[in-house]
């Protein structure tokens, strides 16, 4: 008999290291924001605008490679471990291929910024950050390939350890480049980009060493045999990962486009938005980590053809995610001004950020449901459904509602950033409903249908 308590415990055992690793990685953004804000509100705003371009671009690549997690988990669960190195090596190849267009986009993003009506000094600092962080792209994606390999084998601790190494390195490197220590010039927000590039190369090499020395990972024989690159294998991995990448891109770019749209409203509003979005990203790590753990559990169980276990794991994930999000939403509402104070002492930024954090708290339950349900669907390899539903929710519902409320007087007087955050509530709630309904539909189908879907 399956036991809900046991399954919840196993999910949390997988999710907690993923959470710690994700919080460590996202905390790098927190550190960047705080240390850039220590120079000026303009530097903080530059990090915000640059992140609104850098994050969607790099997370598209990460989304492609996250598809390795259910692939490795199913091969592991079905006893076909000898096929894992072939898949992961083609993941490396895909990471290097996709790095090229991402780097080109980031390096030439100045053309996009030139079209934006932003202060000249803000534009200069934003472009400087992007030109520095472009060198992080291949390292980030190669690191993600190794992390997906380890997590597919239910080893989530390595990502946690390496994440903390990155965070611990990011703080002194920011101090050196942002404030100009040890003979380096004071670079302000641009220094955050330099530090980020160095940190991700450090994380990649640290993860590579871990894979080479860890006994369990060594048994997988990742580098025992080098397979001849097969374009069909790379294309298959791309096709499987593209819906995940696109859905991640649509969610992150929703917030990125908002940052770009409100950038002409001034540094105070942009900085307030950055505070709210950065803290929301930290909170989002809780359900996101649970979603990753759930994709591992569901993928492994489907590899064993344990359909009941996959269903129970999905239920446990959704329940735990909802409980956690209720708790974080309440705490965010109660302590929203204290949270803003962690980022800046600018009174105007604190007031506006507190208002946006209240709106962020409203959608935390919806955000948890949609990301956990998406994790379960990744375990079933139902990637296309995630892509379609998130596109509709974020771009056909959330962003139009946000723009209408924030920038026009069609319904009410322009609400500025508040209108966009109300649009976020609409978009994420729609995504939660559609993805949860899709998961329920799959689990109501025949055993043969579910197994066939997981093997495609």
UniProtKB/Swiss-Prot annotation:
Record's bilayer topology term: Multi-pass membrane protein
Which GO cellular component terms are attached?
Answer: plasma membrane
Q: Name one Pfam family in it.
A: MatE
Segments traversing the membrane: 11-31, 53-73, 93-113, 126-146, 159-179, 193-213, 242-262, 276-296, 315-335, 349-369, 391-411, 417-437
Alphabetically list the UniProt keywords. Antiport, Cell inner membrane, Cell membrane, Ion transport, Membrane, Sodium, Sodium transport, Transmembrane, Transmembrane helix, Transport
- Source domain of life: Bacteria
What is the first-listed, main subcellular location in coarse terms?
Answer: membrane
The record's Gene Ontology biological-process terms are: sodium ion transport
Localization, per the record, is: Cell inner membrane
Could you confirm whether the keyword Transmembrane appears in this record? yes
> What's an example of a GO molecular-function annotation for this chain?
xenobiotic transmembrane transporter activity
The record's annotation in PANTHER family points to:
FMN_FAD EXPORTER YEEO-RELATED, MULTIDRUG RESISTANCE PROTEIN NORM-RELATED
Tell me, in a sentence or two, what this protein's role is: Multidrug efflux pump that functions as a Na(+)/drug antiporter.
Family membership noted in the UniProt record: Belongs to the multi antimicrobial extrusion (MATE) (TC 2.A.66.1) family.
- What is the name of the protein in this document? Multidrug resistance protein NorM
What is the organism of origin for this protein? Photobacterium profundum (strain SS9)
């Amino acid at each position: 008999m399956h036991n809900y308590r046991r399954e919840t415990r196993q999910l949390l055992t997988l999710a907690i290291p993923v959470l710690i690793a994700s919080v460590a990685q996202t905390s790098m953004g927190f550190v960047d924001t705080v240390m850039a804000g220590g120079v000026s509100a303009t530097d903080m705003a530059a990090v915000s605008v640059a992140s609104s371009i850098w994050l969607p671009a790099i997370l598209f690549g990460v989304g492609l490679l996250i598809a390795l997690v259910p692939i490795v988990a199913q091969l592991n669960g079905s006893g076909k471990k000898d096929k894992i190195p072939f898949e992961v090596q083609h993941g490396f190849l895909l990471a290097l291929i996709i790095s090229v267009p991402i780097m080109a986009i980031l390096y030439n993003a100045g053309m996009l910024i030139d079209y934006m009506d932003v202060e000249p000094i803000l534009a200069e600092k934003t472009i400087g950050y992007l030109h520095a962080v472009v060198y992080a792209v291949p390292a980030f994606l190669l690191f993600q390939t190794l992390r997906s390999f380890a997590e597919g084998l239910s080893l989530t601790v390595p990502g946690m350890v390496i994440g903390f190494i990155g965070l611990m390195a990011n703080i002194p490197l920011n101090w050196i480049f942002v404030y100009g220590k040890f003979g380096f010039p004071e670079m302000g927000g641009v220094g955050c980009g330099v530090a980020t590039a160095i940190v991700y190369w450090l994380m990649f090499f640290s993860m590579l060493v871990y894979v080479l020395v860890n006994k369990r990972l060594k048994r997988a024989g990742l580098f025992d045999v080098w397979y001849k690159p097969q374009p069909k294998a790379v294309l298959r991995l791309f096709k499987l990962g593209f819906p995940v990448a696109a859905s991640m891109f649509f969610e992150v770019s929703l917030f990125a486009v908002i940052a770009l749209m409100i950038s002409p409203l001034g540094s105070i509003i942009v900085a307030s938005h950055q505070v709210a979005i950065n803290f929301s990203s930290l909170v989002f790590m809780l359900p996101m980590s649970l979603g990753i753990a759930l994709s591992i559990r569901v993928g492994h169980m489907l590899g064993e053809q344990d359909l009941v276990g996959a269903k129970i794991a999905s239920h446990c994930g959704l329940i735990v995610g909802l409980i956690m999000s209720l708790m974080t939403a309440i705490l965010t509402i109660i302590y929203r001004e204290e949270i803003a104070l962690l980022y800046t002492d600018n009174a105007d930024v604190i007031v506006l950020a507190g208002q946006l954090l209240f709106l962020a708290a409203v959608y935390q339950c919806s955000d948890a449901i949609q990301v956990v349900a998406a994790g379960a669907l990744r375990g079933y390899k139902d990637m296309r459904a995630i892509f379609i539903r998130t596109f509709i929710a974020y771009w056909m519902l959330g962003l139009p509602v946000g723009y209408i409320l924030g920038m026009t007087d069609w319904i009410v007087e322009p609400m500025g950033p508040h209108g966009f955050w109300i649009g976020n509530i609409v978009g994420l709630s729609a995504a939660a409903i559609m993805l949860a309904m899709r998961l329920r539909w799959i689990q109501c189908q025949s055993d043969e249908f579910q197994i066939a879907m997981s093997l495609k």
